Protein backbone atom coordinates (compact mmCIF):
# COMPACT_ATOMS: atom_id res chain seq x y z
CA UNK A 1 0.00 0.00 0.00
CA UNK A 2 1.13 3.58 -0.61
CA UNK A 3 0.50 5.00 2.87
CA UNK A 4 1.02 2.84 5.95
CA UNK A 5 -0.38 4.61 9.00
CA UNK A 6 -1.12 1.63 11.19
CA UNK A 7 0.07 -1.86 12.02
CA UNK A 8 -1.95 -3.30 9.15
CA UNK A 9 -4.05 -2.27 6.21
CA UNK A 10 -7.18 -3.31 8.11
CA UNK A 11 -6.36 -1.18 11.16
CA UNK A 12 -5.51 1.75 8.91
CA UNK A 13 -8.83 1.44 7.11
CA UNK A 14 -10.79 1.23 10.37
CA UNK A 15 -8.94 4.13 11.96
CA UNK A 16 -9.27 6.35 8.89
CA UNK A 17 -12.97 5.56 8.57
CA UNK A 18 -13.59 6.45 12.22
CA UNK A 19 -11.70 9.73 11.94
CA UNK A 20 -13.56 10.61 8.74
CA UNK A 21 -16.93 9.78 10.30
CA UNK A 22 -16.25 11.82 13.43
CA UNK A 23 -15.08 14.79 11.35
CA UNK A 24 -18.19 14.65 9.15
CA UNK A 25 -20.53 14.43 12.13
CA UNK A 26 -18.72 17.31 13.84
CA UNK A 27 -18.99 19.36 10.63
CA UNK A 28 -22.74 18.80 10.44
CA UNK A 29 -23.13 19.80 14.08
CA UNK A 30 -21.02 22.94 13.60
CA UNK A 31 -22.61 24.06 10.33
CA UNK A 32 -25.66 25.89 11.80
CA UNK A 33 -23.33 27.82 14.12
CA UNK A 34 -20.39 28.36 11.77
CA UNK A 35 -20.61 32.14 11.63
CA UNK A 36 -21.03 32.43 15.40
CA UNK A 37 -18.08 30.11 16.05
CA UNK A 38 -15.92 32.00 13.57
CA UNK A 39 -16.67 35.33 15.18
CA UNK A 40 -16.11 33.98 18.68
CA UNK A 41 -12.70 32.58 17.72
CA UNK A 42 -11.63 35.79 16.00
CA UNK A 43 -12.69 37.90 19.00
CA UNK A 44 -10.64 35.80 21.43
CA UNK A 45 -7.44 37.42 22.63
CA UNK A 46 -4.40 35.37 21.62
CA UNK A 47 -0.97 36.51 22.90
CA UNK A 48 1.17 38.11 20.21
CA UNK A 49 3.92 35.51 19.93
CA UNK A 50 1.45 32.63 19.93
CA UNK A 51 -0.67 34.33 17.28
CA UNK A 52 2.42 34.89 15.11
CA UNK A 53 3.43 31.25 15.53
CA UNK A 54 -0.03 30.08 14.46
CA UNK A 55 0.01 32.31 11.39
CA UNK A 56 3.54 31.22 10.47
CA UNK A 57 2.38 27.60 10.50
CA UNK A 58 0.30 28.36 7.40
CA UNK A 59 3.46 27.46 5.49
CA UNK A 60 2.61 23.80 6.11
CA UNK A 61 -0.68 24.28 4.24
CA UNK A 62 0.24 26.84 1.59
CA UNK A 63 1.17 25.68 -1.91
CA UNK A 64 4.47 27.54 -2.00
CA UNK A 65 5.36 26.41 1.51
CA UNK A 66 4.70 22.77 0.65
CA UNK A 67 6.74 23.10 -2.54
CA UNK A 68 9.66 24.49 -0.54
CA UNK A 69 9.43 21.76 2.12
CA UNK A 70 9.12 18.88 -0.33
CA UNK A 71 11.73 20.29 -2.72
CA UNK A 72 14.22 20.60 0.12
CA UNK A 73 13.57 17.04 1.24
CA UNK A 74 13.90 15.74 -2.33
CA UNK A 75 17.23 17.52 -2.58
CA UNK A 76 18.79 16.40 0.70
CA UNK A 77 17.26 12.93 1.16
CA UNK A 78 18.11 10.95 -1.95
CA UNK A 79 17.50 7.62 -0.23
CA UNK A 80 13.78 8.37 0.18
CA UNK A 81 13.37 10.26 -3.09
CA UNK A 82 10.93 7.72 -4.56
CA UNK A 83 8.67 7.89 -1.50
CA UNK A 84 8.89 11.67 -1.42
CA UNK A 85 7.72 11.90 -5.02
CA UNK A 86 4.72 9.74 -4.16
CA UNK A 87 3.98 11.94 -1.16
CA UNK A 88 4.27 15.06 -3.32
CA UNK A 89 1.84 13.68 -5.90
CA UNK A 90 -0.58 12.79 -3.10
CA UNK A 91 -0.44 16.31 -1.64
CA UNK A 92 -0.96 17.79 -5.10
CA UNK A 93 -3.98 15.56 -5.75
CA UNK A 94 -5.65 16.43 -2.43
CA UNK A 95 -5.07 20.14 -2.95
CA UNK A 96 -6.48 20.05 -6.48
CA UNK A 97 -9.59 18.11 -5.45
CA UNK A 98 -10.32 20.43 -2.53
CA UNK A 99 -9.94 23.50 -4.72
CA UNK A 100 -12.13 21.99 -7.43
CA UNK A 101 -14.85 21.38 -4.83
CA UNK A 102 -14.71 24.96 -3.56
CA UNK A 103 -15.13 26.32 -7.08
CA UNK A 104 -18.24 24.20 -7.53
CA UNK A 105 -19.89 25.17 -4.22
CA UNK A 106 -19.89 28.94 -3.46
CA UNK A 107 -19.70 29.97 0.19
CA UNK A 108 -18.78 33.38 1.53
CA UNK A 109 -15.70 33.47 3.71
CA UNK A 110 -16.37 34.56 7.30
CA UNK A 111 -13.99 37.51 6.99
CA UNK A 112 -16.23 39.08 4.31
CA UNK A 113 -19.06 39.79 6.77
CA UNK A 114 -19.23 43.30 8.17
CA UNK A 115 -22.36 42.47 10.18
CA UNK A 116 -22.28 40.41 13.31
CA UNK A 117 -24.35 37.21 13.51
CA UNK A 118 -26.97 36.57 16.13
CA UNK A 119 -24.92 34.76 18.69
CA UNK A 120 -25.13 33.47 22.22
CA UNK A 121 -21.33 33.28 21.94
CA UNK A 122 -21.13 37.08 21.77
CA UNK A 123 -22.70 38.55 24.92
CA UNK A 124 -21.45 42.05 23.98
CA UNK A 125 -23.27 42.16 20.65
CA UNK A 126 -25.21 45.25 19.62
CA UNK A 127 -28.93 44.43 20.01
CA UNK A 128 -29.75 46.86 17.19
CA UNK A 129 -27.45 45.16 14.67
CA UNK A 130 -28.77 43.54 11.50
CA UNK A 131 -27.99 39.89 12.08
CA UNK A 132 -27.10 37.26 9.52
CA UNK A 133 -27.31 33.49 9.70
CA UNK A 134 -24.66 30.88 8.96
CA UNK A 135 -26.93 29.58 6.20
CA UNK A 136 -26.78 32.96 4.42
CA UNK A 137 -23.18 32.29 3.44
CA UNK A 138 -24.09 29.59 0.90
CA UNK A 139 -24.62 30.29 -2.80
CA UNK A 140 -26.07 28.21 -5.61
CA UNK A 141 -23.62 25.74 -7.22
CA UNK A 142 -21.91 26.95 -10.38
CA UNK A 143 -23.60 30.36 -10.27
CA UNK A 144 -20.79 32.62 -9.07
CA UNK A 145 -17.64 33.94 -10.74
CA UNK A 146 -14.76 31.46 -10.71
CA UNK A 147 -12.36 34.30 -9.98
CA UNK A 148 -14.06 35.57 -6.82
CA UNK A 149 -11.97 34.16 -3.97
CA UNK A 150 -14.23 35.72 -1.34
CA UNK A 151 -16.83 32.98 -1.99
CA UNK A 152 -14.41 30.03 -2.04
CA UNK A 153 -14.70 28.97 1.58
CA UNK A 154 -15.96 25.37 1.29
CA UNK A 155 -14.00 23.16 1.77
CA UNK A 156 -10.66 24.40 3.09
CA UNK A 157 -7.94 23.77 0.53
CA UNK A 158 -5.28 24.73 3.07
CA UNK A 159 -6.54 22.15 5.56
CA UNK A 160 -6.75 19.42 2.91
CA UNK A 161 -3.18 20.22 1.89
CA UNK A 162 -1.92 20.27 5.49
CA UNK A 163 -3.54 16.92 6.31
CA UNK A 164 -2.14 15.50 3.07
CA UNK A 165 1.32 16.76 4.05
CA UNK A 166 1.00 15.07 7.44
CA UNK A 167 -0.03 11.78 5.85
CA UNK A 168 2.56 11.94 3.08
CA UNK A 169 5.46 12.86 5.37
CA UNK A 170 4.41 10.19 7.87
CA UNK A 171 4.63 7.67 5.03
CA UNK A 172 8.24 8.74 4.43
CA UNK A 173 9.25 9.46 8.02
CA UNK A 174 7.00 7.43 10.39
CA UNK A 175 8.73 8.65 13.56
CA UNK A 176 7.76 12.22 12.73
CA UNK A 177 4.02 11.47 12.78
CA UNK A 178 3.23 13.41 16.03
CA UNK A 179 5.07 16.49 14.74
CA UNK A 180 3.40 16.36 11.32
CA UNK A 181 -0.06 15.98 12.85
CA UNK A 182 0.64 18.88 15.21
CA UNK A 183 1.71 21.10 12.32
CA UNK A 184 -1.38 20.17 10.30
CA UNK A 185 -3.63 20.90 13.29
CA UNK A 186 -2.11 24.34 13.88
CA UNK A 187 -2.29 25.13 10.15
CA UNK A 188 -6.00 24.27 10.18
CA UNK A 189 -6.52 26.41 13.29
CA UNK A 190 -4.84 29.31 11.49
CA UNK A 191 -7.55 29.24 8.82
CA UNK A 192 -10.21 29.64 11.51
CA UNK A 193 -8.39 32.43 13.34
CA UNK A 194 -7.72 34.30 10.10
CA UNK A 195 -11.40 34.25 9.18
CA UNK A 196 -10.60 32.43 5.94
CA UNK A 197 -12.78 29.40 6.70
CA UNK A 198 -15.58 28.18 8.92
CA UNK A 199 -15.12 25.27 11.28
CA UNK A 200 -17.19 22.98 9.04
CA UNK A 201 -14.99 23.88 6.03
CA UNK A 202 -11.99 22.65 7.97
CA UNK A 203 -13.64 19.50 9.29
CA UNK A 204 -15.00 18.44 5.89
CA UNK A 205 -11.50 18.68 4.40
CA UNK A 206 -10.27 15.88 6.68
CA UNK A 207 -12.45 13.02 5.32
CA UNK A 208 -11.86 14.33 1.80
CA UNK A 209 -8.11 13.88 2.25
CA UNK A 210 -8.49 10.53 4.00
CA UNK A 211 -10.67 9.29 1.15
CA UNK A 212 -7.93 10.13 -1.34
CA UNK A 213 -5.34 8.44 0.89
CA UNK A 214 -7.40 5.24 1.06
CA UNK A 215 -7.87 5.32 -2.71
CA UNK A 216 -4.08 5.50 -3.10
CA UNK A 217 -3.43 2.78 -0.52
Report the location of each language-model feature.
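N-terminal transmembrane-helix/juxtamembrane module of multi-pass inner/ER membrane proteins
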Residues: 1-70, 102-120, 131, 139, ...
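Membrane-embedded catalytic cores of phosphoryl/pyrophosphoryl-handling enzymes
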Residues: 3-20, 125-217
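Alpha-helical transmembrane spans of integral membrane proteins, capturing the lipid-embedded, hydrophobic core
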Residues: 20-24, 67, 87, 91-99, ...
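Aromatic-anchored segments of alpha-helical transmembrane domains
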Residues: 24-28, 92-100, 184-195
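Short helix-capping/hinge motifs at transmembrane helix termini and TM-loop junctions
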Residues: 31-33, 77-78, 105-106, 194-198
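Membrane-helix interface segments
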Residues: 49, 79-83, 173-179
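Hydrophobic alpha-helical transmembrane segments
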Residues: 58-73, 158-169
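Interfacial segments of alpha-helical transmembrane regions
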Residues: 72-104
